[in-house]
């Protein structure tokens, strides 16, 4: 009997192509599953859920596959969104996509797949998995511009054992071409960007609905002079340049730290200011695809679009590591995910813990 694969269909071109490839080029029985994580009334229609569902219906109809819907809105609010708000209110910059993958897509959605009689879950992530005697390895996607292994660095290893990533060996250009040649309804649909529950609204106008404004000072760290004012230190991220609205200097200003107790945002002037760079950090909430005891040196990404940075890892108990970089790294942000790599293989990841007040190299 042919095995069943359930495709997580978002209404976008990537998951549409996944369903198309599995339907037409494998022997699997293919089902579609649309996952709703946000109630539109919760956020004044911030997510285009209705339009996305219509696109799932169209593509499923084109491919002649059955499709289902599941809502994890309550669980998403409890396990992802609440942590997002708590993190920001405490001055961190959490990554909800990493949390969503771990808590929703590769946990609750996996359970729904089994309820539907599925043997495998397939998604449109640009990454790969490779089994060996120790389980499954998470590998980068071959398209360096679209590789999404970073977002899965916090996902439990066992959650990836029955997962298929058909786009891991393809580029975005190839995926668009496949969609166009197949005449899929989503072939020309734009990629979604940013955080789903924020949509197209400015980040500040969204966050202030949940975390109250609190006016405070913007301080030049070098001179300790007040150079401006803000409506909440939680709106600012280490390394941020835009939105400061500070004049009086030929050099651009960057956020270099925050004092959440005093509600102060610290800035420095110049993109090469030494306080913007760090040589080490602590990571917690660790998740490993290999034994951390086997790792001494590796590379790391401190944010999605950052370069790989060579580093060494020093274990500090069960759920903490000290990461020392070979060269200073700019704008390390507390609360963001850090992913560790050995070449194309993702070794694991964690959450960055670093002082929010400026620290010299």
UniProtKB/Swiss-Prot annotation:
GO-annotated molecular function: ATP binding; tRNA binding; tRNA-uridine 2-sulfurtransferase activity
Organism superkingdom: Bacteria
Example of a GO biological process term: tRNA wobble position uridine thiolation
Region (Interaction with tRNA): 146-148, 303-304
Residues annotated as site: Interaction with tRNA: 125, 336
Region of interest (Interaction with target base in tRNA), ranges: 95-97
Catalytic reaction list: S-sulfanyl-L-cysteinyl-[protein] + uridine(34) in tRNA + AH2 + ATP = 2-thiouridine(34) in tRNA + L-cysteinyl-[protein] + A + AMP + diphosphate + H(+)
Active-site residues per Swiss-Prot or TrEMBL entry: 100, 196
Protein name: tRNA-specific 2-thiouridylase MnmA
Gene that produces this protein: mnmA
């Amino acid at each position: 009997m042919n095995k069943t694969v359930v495709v997580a269909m978002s209404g976008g071109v990537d998951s549409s192509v996944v369903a198309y490839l599995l339907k037409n080029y494998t022997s699997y029985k293919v089902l579609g599953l649309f996952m709703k994580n946000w109630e539109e009334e919760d956020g004044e229609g911030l997510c285009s859920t209705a339009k996305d569902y219509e696109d799932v219906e169209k593509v499923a109809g084109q491919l002649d596959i059955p499709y289902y819907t599941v809502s994890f809105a309550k669980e998403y609010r409890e396990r992802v969104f609440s942590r997002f708000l708590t993190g920001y209110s405490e001055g961190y910059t959490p990554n909800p996509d990493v949390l969503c993958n771990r808590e929703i897509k590769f946990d609750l959605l996996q359970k729904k797949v089994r309820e539907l009689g599925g043997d495998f879950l397939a998604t449109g992530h640009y990454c790969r998995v490779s089994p060996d005697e120790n389980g499954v390895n998470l590998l980068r996607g071959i398209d360096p511009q679209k590789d999404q292994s970073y977002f899965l660095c916090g996902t439990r290893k066992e959650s990836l054992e029955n997962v298929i990533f058909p786009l891991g060996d393809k580029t975005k250009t190839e995926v668009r071409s496949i969609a166009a040649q197949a005449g899929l309804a989503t072939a020309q649909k734009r990629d979604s960007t940013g955080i789903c529950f924020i949509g197209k609204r400015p980040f500040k106008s969204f966050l202030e609905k949940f975390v109250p404004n609190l006016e405070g000072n913007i301080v030049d760290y070098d001179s300790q002079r007040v150079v401006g004012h803000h409506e909440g230190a939680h709106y600012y991220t280490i390394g941020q340049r835009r939105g400061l609205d500070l004049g009086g200097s030929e050099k651009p200003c960057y956020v270099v730290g925050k004092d959440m107790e005093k509600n102060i945002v610290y800035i420095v002037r110049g993109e090469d200011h030494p306080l913007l760079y760090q040589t080490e950090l602590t990571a917690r909430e660790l998740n490993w695809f290999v034994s951390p005891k086997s790792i001494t040196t590796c590379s790391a990404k401190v944010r999605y679009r950052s370069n790989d940075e060579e580093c060494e890892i020093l274990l500090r108990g069960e759920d903490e590591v000290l990461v020392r970089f070979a060269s200073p790294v700019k704008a390390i942000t507390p609360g963001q995910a850090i992913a560790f790599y050995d070449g194309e293989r993702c070794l694991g990841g964690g959450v960055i813990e670093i002082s929010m007040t400026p620290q010299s190299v």
